[in-house]
């Protein structure tokens, strides 16, 4: 169904028809008329084939071919060729898309509609059905079984509309459709091959009226059966589209779940599920108090136990706020990168424009100088030559100055960025030093508490003190302190070392 080839496909029952030669003025009524004419030609060809297949017995009577067996459930070619019978006004084209359908008006430009679908053309089907087998309104609707009311027995419409097709399996539905096709073919065959006996002179008007009424009743039955068959096939198309749509939605859900899982793995780690379930267990384990602790610590922990849920809620709120700020930060970084890229592109364009202007001006000056030197070659020409040379040097110096100014601006920007990074590193270093100072005080406090305990405990405290002394010595002997003396880091190191008493003195 390529729109460049001016052709579309229309489904008739379970057969796909390709309608070619469309133009921008082709309407749905034109397509219906062409399909009905094709059906009439097929019926005529089959009728001629049936006439050629008639055999004459010795008694001189014509013998019709044997009708198909009604109990043959596996006959797939039971669709009658005379399925489309009636005027074009009795048929319409239904547009089906992802389980939704609507009736197309007769004046709809079908090629324009098909082109407007764009990428969704593979999910669109045009189905030719009888007008009685579709809804009266032309709006979109979901697939739902519709009961065709009988005009002869209106009492069946009093009860609730039954939907037995939903309870049947796919094989049973296929058998029902085949049986309906065979029955409709049988009715059409009887109507087409009914022997036309010559009217005798003694035939009355009563006999002719009875035959006409029987023929009318038979045609009404055929139309009703055809309507039911079209309805079943239309619902079959709709159900297939709905099943395909459900599979697409399942695939989209799987892709989204995999994306969310990978996102969480990158954000919270591979074992984020276990960590989430073990958060409560970790809080419970931290809330347990050992037996050898003093009673004051136990009472203090008991007093903080009821506030644990509040802490967890506050932690969750803080995590949400942190996630929101991280998203804002990422968005700002993306905008900053875009602005920087735009700035670089504009700078390159400006520089290129300046170069072109300078070269153009230089060429014009050279051309003017050549023209001025041609008339006279005396002292005036030498003065003009010297003037042009000085002017050329001035323009060159101006160009070089512009380039140096541009480079200077770039260097200033890099210097500002480096200054910002240095400030950030300095703040981080101050935070680490503060943490180290706090840790030293904690170690000193633990050593003071451990001095009153058994004599076997000072050995681990001495190891901790040695580690702290080594850390302090590394902090003081850092070679970067001399370079950063203007920032006050060396004075801060000296203040820290002076303010904190040695660990050995505290132990003594």
Swiss-Prot record:
Residues 235-266, 319-358 form a coiled coil. It is found in: Cytoplasm, Cytosol; Cytoplasm, Cytoskeleton, Microtubule organizing center, Centrosome; Cytoplasm, Cytoskeleton, Spindle pole. CDD domains: RA_RASSF10. InterPro entries: N-RASSF, RA_dom, RASSF10_RA, RASSF8/10_RA, Ubiquitin-like_domsf. Its main location: cytoplasm. Residues 487-498 have a biased composition (Polar residues). GO terms for biological process: nervous system development; positive regulation of neural precursor cell proliferation; positive regulation of neurogenesis; signal transduction. One of its GO terms (cellular component) is cytosol. Residues 195-214 have a biased composition (Low complexity). Residues 66-78 have a biased composition (Acidic residues). Expressed in neural progenitor cells (at protein level). Pfam families: RASSF8-10_RA (PF21712). Residues 51-81, 186-221, 473-508 are annotated as: Disordered. Signal peptide: none annotated. Keywords: Coiled coil, Cytoplasm, Cytoskeleton, Neurogenesis. Residues 1-133 form the Ras-associating domain. PANTHER family: RAS ASSOCIATION DOMAIN-CONTAINING PROTEIN 10, RAS-ASSOCIATING DOMAIN CONTAINING PROTEIN. Plays an important role in regulating embryonic neurogenesis. This is Ras association domain-containing protein 10. The lineage of its organism: Eukaryota, Metazoa, Chordata, Craniata, Vertebrata.
């Amino acid at each position: 169904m390529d729109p460049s080839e001016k052709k579309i496909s229309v489904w008739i029952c379970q057969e796909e028809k390709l309608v070619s030669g469309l133009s921008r003025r082709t309407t749905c009524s034109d397509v219906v008329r062409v399909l009905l004419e094709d059906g009439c030609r097929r019926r005529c060809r089959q009728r001629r084939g049936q006439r050629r297949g008639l055999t004459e017995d010795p008694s001189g009577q014509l013998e019709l071919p044997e009708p198909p067996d009604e109990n043959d459930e596996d006959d797939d070619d039971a669709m009658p060729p005379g399925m489309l019978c009636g005027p074009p006004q009795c048929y319409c084209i239904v547009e089906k898309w992802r389980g939704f359908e609507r009736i197309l008006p007769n004046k709809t430009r079908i090629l324009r509609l098909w082109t407007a679908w764009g990428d969704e053309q593979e999910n669109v089907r045009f189905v030719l059905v009888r007008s009685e087998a579709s809804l009266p309104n032309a709006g979109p609707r979901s697939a739902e079984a519709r009961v065709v009311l009988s005009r002869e027995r209106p009492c069946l419409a009093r009860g609730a509309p039954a939907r037995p097709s939903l309870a049947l399996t796919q094989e049973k539905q296929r058998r029902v459709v085949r049986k309906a096709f065979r029955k409709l073919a049988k009715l059409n065959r009887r109507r087409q091959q009914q022997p036309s006996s010559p009217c005798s002179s003694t035939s009355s008007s009563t006999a002719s009226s009875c035959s006409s009424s029987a023929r009318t009743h038979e045609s009404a039955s055929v139309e009703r059966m055809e309507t039911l068959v079209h309805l079943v096939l239309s619902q079959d198309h709709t159900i297939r589209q709905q099943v395909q749509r459900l599979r697409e939605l399942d695939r989209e859900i799987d892709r989204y779940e995999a994306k969310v899982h990978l996102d969480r793995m990158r954000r919270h780690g591979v074992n984020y599920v276990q960590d989430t379930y073990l958060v409560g267990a970790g809080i419970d384990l931290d809330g347990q108090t050992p037996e050898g602790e003093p009673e004051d610590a136990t009472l203090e922990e008991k007093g903080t136990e009821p506030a644990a849920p509040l802490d967890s809620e506050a932690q969750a709120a803080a995590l949400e706020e942190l996630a929101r700020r991280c998203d804002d930060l990422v968005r700002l970084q993306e905008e900053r990168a875009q602005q920087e890229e735009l700035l670089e592109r504009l700078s390159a364009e400006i520089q290129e424009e300046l170069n072109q202007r300078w070269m153009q001006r230089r060429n014009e000056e050279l051309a003017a100088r050549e023209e001025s030197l041609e008339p006279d070659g005396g002292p005036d020409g030498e003065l003009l030559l010297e003037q042009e040379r000085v002017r050329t040097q001035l323009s060159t110096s101006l160009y070089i100055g512009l380039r140096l100014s541009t480079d200077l601006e770039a260097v200033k920007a890099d210097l500002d960025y480096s200054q910002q990074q240095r400030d950030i590193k300095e703040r981080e270093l101050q935070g680490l030093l503060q943490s180290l100072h706090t840790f030293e005080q904690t170690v000193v406090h633990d050593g003071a508490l451990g001095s009153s305990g058994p004599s076997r405990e000072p050995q681990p405290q001495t190891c901790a003190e040695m580690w702290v002394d080594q850390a302090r010595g590394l902090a003081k002997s850092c070679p970067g302190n001399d370079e950063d003396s203007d920032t006050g880091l060396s004075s801060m190191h000296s203040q820290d070392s002076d303010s904190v008493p040695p660990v050995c003195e505290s132990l003594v």
